[in-house]
Regions:
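Intrinsically disordered, low-complexity segments enriched in Gly and acidic/Ser/Thr residues
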Residues: 58-60
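Conserved nucleotide-sugar donor-binding
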Residues: 1-12
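Short Asp/Glu-rich motifs
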Residues: 54-55
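Non-catalytic, C-terminal membrane-associated alpha-helical segments of glycosyltransferases
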Residues: 62-132
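Catalytic beta-strand/loop signature of glycosyltransferases that borders the donor
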Residues: 13-15, 39-51, 63-64
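Hydrophobic residues within well-ordered alpha-helices
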Residues: 34-36
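Acidic donor-binding loop at a coil-to-helix junction in glycosyltransferase catalytic cores
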Residues: 16-30
Length: 132
């Protein structure tokens, strides 16, 4: 995608998604989805453009309740019609790596569903917990 095409179509990163925001990840996914929805030609090229130290993170705290809630919100932002189906497919496909003794598949799916619905009603994980 060319920069001028992005500007012409007024595609921007979502301010609610990404490190330091209400929903801790997914800004890149939503950005690319928006480019495709606008009909822009998106391609990938397998070049290494950066090296990132993955040993510590200021926002990723593991596969905890917020992770699954935010994952549901991401899929809610991606698609009203197919978002929940896609979310369930991703959770099922990655069930061996995402779930552990602390959070079961069933619990993670329930949290993701809450995030999916919560996003539609502007309820973040923090607001949800404040109301409980």
């Amino acid at each position: 995608v060319k920069n001028k095409s992005i500007k012409r179509e007024n595609v921007i990163f979502h301010r609610l998604f990404g490190g330091g925001t209400d929903y801790s990840a997914g800004e890149d996914t939503l950005f690319i989805a928006d480019l495709i929805k606008k009909g822009l030609k998106v391609y990938s090229y397998p070049a290494n453009i950066a090296s990132v130290d993955q040993s510590t993170s200021t926002w990723f705290k593991g596969y905890n309740e917020k992770f699954f809630y935010d994952k549901g919100a991401l899929f809610g932002a991606l698609s009203k019609r197919y978002g929940w189906l896609l979310c369930r497919l991703v959770l099922w496909k990655n069930r061996r790596s995402l779930f552990n003794a602390n959070i079961s598949y069933r619990c993670g799916k329930k949290l993701a569903k809450a995030g999916f619905v919560g996003f539609r009603h502007n309820v973040t994980y923090e607001r949800r917990n404040d109301n409980e």
